[in-house]
Every structure is written in C-alpha cells, then in structure tokens.
C-alpha cells in the first residue's frame, strides 16, 4: 500500500488553481481591452462628425476644431497678416443730399430717422439673455450687438435659440471649405469682370461665420482675399468693382465689396483699411440720387424717368452703408444718406405692402424682402411699413412663390433678403419662413459643398441661377451660405 500524500494547505491549493487559470485570465483581459478600444473609436467617430452646440466651455466646437479663447490684448495684425500699407488717398467729395433736397420732390418727406448709435453687447436688451459672446482670435473689442452672435460660443447658442439645426451649420462649413478650394491664386474669386463682387460675397460668407485672417482653418483664405481687395481697390482709386468707371453691374459689385470691407473693420479694427473704406463709401454717398435712390453707374438724373434709381440697386448700397455705420468711424454723409434712402423706400412701397422697382405702381414681389430688411436695418422699428411688407411677403410665398430650390419660381436673390427680413421681425413670420427655407436650402447642397444649377431663374438674375460654371456657382453658394448663417450673422436689435 502506497504511502498517502501529505495533506495540502489552503494556500498551496489556491496557488495551483491560480496557476491553472492564468492563461484564461490573461486572454480574457486582452479581449476586454480590445473591445473597449474598438467601441471608443466608433463612438469618437460618431460624435466627431457632429458640430457641438452645447460645449460646456462656452465656446462653439464644430468639426473644424475648437475655437480657442482670444488673448486679452489686441492681436498684432502687423506680424500675423500681410496687407499692404493703407494708401494715402482722398475720398471723393461727399455731396450728400439733405432733407431740403428731398423735400423739393412731390412726395411727403418723412421725419429724418435719428442717428442710430452702434450698440454694444452690454447696452442691448434684445439679445437673448443666455447668449454671451466670446472673442475668438482676430476679433478686437466689443462688437455691435447685432453682430455679437457670429463669434465664439454665442454662435452655437444663437443657432439653437433661433431654430437652426446642426445640419444647416454643417452645410455652412462644407460651403466655406468649397470656397477655399476654388479661391484663385491671387486671393480673389470669380473670373474677369466678376472678381470684385464674388470676392466681396465670399468675404461676407467667411466674416458671417466669425472668421478673420488669424482663424485656424479659414484665416489664410480670408487674408489672401483682403490682400487682393486692398491692392486692387487702391489701384482703381477706391472703385471696388475693379474697373476704371462704374458700369451697370459695377454698382452692385462695389457695394458688396464695400459691405465686406466695413464688416472686416468692425470685427478687427484693422486701421490699414480705413482710408480705402472711406473712399469706397464716398462713391456710394456721392452717387445717391436726389430722391434717395441709387442708379446704374451712380447716375443721379435720367431724363424721362420718375426716379433715376431702383430698389434692387439701393438694397446693396443701404447694406454697405449700415455696415459702415457700425464701424463707429463716423464717415461723413453716411447717416444722412441712410435717412434719405428711407424716404425713397417709403415712396416706392405699394398699397399691398410690397415694394416697387422704381415706384409704387411697379410692384415686384422679389423686392418685398429688400424693402422690409433695409427699412428695418436703419430704423430698427417694426412699424407699419415693415409689418405690411412682411404680410405681403408671407402671403405671396404661401400662395404663389414657394421656397423650392428647383421650383419654377425659385429666386435666391429674393430669398436672401426674405430670410433676414423674417428673422428681424420674428414671430409667426420667422417660424413659418424658417420651416420653409432651412431644410430646402440645406438639402439642395451638392456633395462638394457648392450649390448646383437651378432649373429656372427670374429674368433679372438669369444665368447666375442656372449656369453650371462661371460666376453662377459662386453666386448661388455664397447666397445660400449667407442664408444659413442667418441664425447668428445679424441679430435683431433696438436703438
């Protein structure tokens, strides 16, 4: 009989069990680590593709990266961007019309609108209480309240409060990235004869998103565009249409580019563009007709015409002048020209609330938004003129002019104004308009970030809506970007 083995202690038996199971334990641990890592990658990929409008840091986080907090002191633009020195130029003589000039016309003269001081964030009571603007890199000093939500964390909060969706903000980013890809080597956009307008449009799109020359992703594109605009604007003596004389389309191009230059100065306080801005705005002020309108070529008098100007041209001049007013530079003639423009808009308003091309008997539905927006931009009042215009706009849209990108009566030019006008008025008009336009414009975007040709177009716009190349794709893309930036680009304000 074999001798019995000595009884093993508890510790010995435990050691044997652990030794036998060590390979199983190691294998299980490795598999658990792998599953954790794979799951983390999937979740990261999912959330990285979505703009984060609720970042706890107070800054908007989008898929182009986190917007860093600005330095407390003003950024040194001399070292970080390379604009040419401001040219020593003299603005054209500002023969701004006066109320007396207007009163000689057979129309009732409206009381001159009081000068609207550019409000700052702390002084405004119409900005939502929980929108606290930040200042990303390149933005200097407090912005006027109406522009305060285009930067930092305020952008995301304004998006949510005003009914924006992450899909529309993602479309804006795709559009801006497309603009970067198609920018000309010299910094401009568009071909010969269109570069002034298209570069101005593109700058407005970038600035509307809070981008400056020192922005992480879009800064280089903005910088190159400003170099091109300032160099060529100086070359053509402040004519931002980039021609020696103002032709028919030149008054549009000039005003659009001046509009962008005014916004740029307001956001950065870059003093090197002041002289060029003064000269450019001088042409607009000096080119206003006696009745407060603007005409092709800035012609002040046209024999046989009741008015030398038209509402379509006036719309861009008014936007450029309001942007100039917001700079705080107090350029002579600007406020008076805006007062006079309000007199003209009252003159051309139609009995149904719409606005005429040259007068109240020349009603154009596409100009209704022009009249409403431009009136509100300067008067900052929801008066009878504005509300009658909004009623006309909404009734016409719902009954005859639906917001359909590929519809028979599609009109991006009108929608650009209508979108802003409805936001400024707010209420049911904005709720209905936002429902009609936001998804339609977002879904119409092409995969590359541009907006494709449309099936039809109003005669006044023509090929810009329907052509596949040329300036048309730039025109469509910029207007759509600006529409989708409406939630934060300009906020309704009061005096």
Segments from the language model and where they lie:
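Intrinsic-disorder/low-complexity signature in envelope-associated proteins
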Residues: 2-9, 27, 42-163, 167-169, ...
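An alpha-helical repeat/solenoid feature that recognizes helix-turn-helix modules
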Residues: 133-174, 188-221, 234-282, 286-340, ...
